[in-house]
Curated annotation (Swiss-Prot):
The keyword GTP-binding does not apply. One of its GO terms (molecular function) is tRNA binding. This is Large ribosomal subunit protein uL5. Keywords: Ribonucleoprotein, Ribosomal protein, RNA-binding, rRNA-binding, tRNA-binding. Pfam families: Ribosomal_L5, Ribosomal_L5_C. This is one of the proteins that bind and probably mediate the attachment of the 5S RNA into the large ribosomal subunit, where it forms part of the central protuberance. In the 70S ribosome it contacts protein S13 of the 30S subunit (bridge B1b), connecting the 2 subunits; this bridge is implicated in subunit movement. Contacts the P site tRNA; the 5S rRNA and some of its associated proteins might help stabilize positioning of ribosome-bound tRNAs. One of its GO terms (cellular component) is ribosome. Belongs to the universal ribosomal protein uL5 family.
Length: 194
């Protein structure tokens, strides 16, 4: 998944495979496709946010530990526990109760996660027909949901206490949805044709 490049200060440092491909092939293709005059106009990936909401944690606080453990295994980074901003009596929710976990990935970890997501995790989804090309937010950012955490190979299926879904947001520097779609398609995101 990584390619090694020579760096004077630290010696050999691995460069994520997808990042290498973006620099060498994808950026040039996008520049040609959208006829950018400046290299800074070429869209790139800024960060990936992985969010796991655990609404049942309001009744059982131990459930949040499983979500934190799963997210840490999937992303390789310690998740931030998200707490309720205000109390809602109908949901038996009090202000400050843990209700989810979130991880923001940047840099090499982000590229490695995207590579694993596209090449390993998404193909493991049962009856997968591709991602919807319409879930862009108008500014080139893409958000989609995954219904179960077992599609990631880091999760041991025998140790799953309950099935949890997650939201994955890919934030890009693209200014339009078409640019963002072209970038993610070039990175290997399997969008279905409508």
């Amino acid at each position: 998944m990584t390619v090694t490049t020579e760096d004077r200060t630290t010696g050999a440092r691995p460069v994520p495979r997808l990042k290498q491909r973006y620099r060498e092939e994808i950026a040039a293709t996008l520049r040609e496709e959208f006829s950018y005059r400046n290299v800074m106009q070429i869209p790139g990936v800024v960060k990936v946010v992985v969010n796991m909401g655990v609404g049942d944690a309001a009744r059982d606080a131990k459930l949040i530990d499983g979500a934190v453990r799963d997210l840490a295994a999937i992303t390789g980074q310690k998740p931030a526990v998200r707490r309720a901003k205000k109390s809602i009596a109908q949901f038996k929710l009090r202000e400050g109760m843990p209700i989810g976990a979130k991880v923001t990935l940047r840099g090499d970890r982000m590229w490695e996660f995207l590579d694993r997501l596209v090449s390993i995790a998404l193909p493991r989804i049962r009856d997968f027909r591709g991602l919807s090309p319409k879930q862009f937010d108008g500014a080139g950012n893409y958000t989609f949901g995954v219904t179960e955490q077992s599609i990631f190979h880091e999760i041991d299926i025998d140790r799953i206490d309950r099935v949890r879904g997650m939201d994955i947001t890919v934030v890009t520097t693209a200014t339009t949805d078409d640019e963002g779609r072209a970038l993610l398609r070039a990175l290997g995101f399997p969008f279905r044709e409508n």
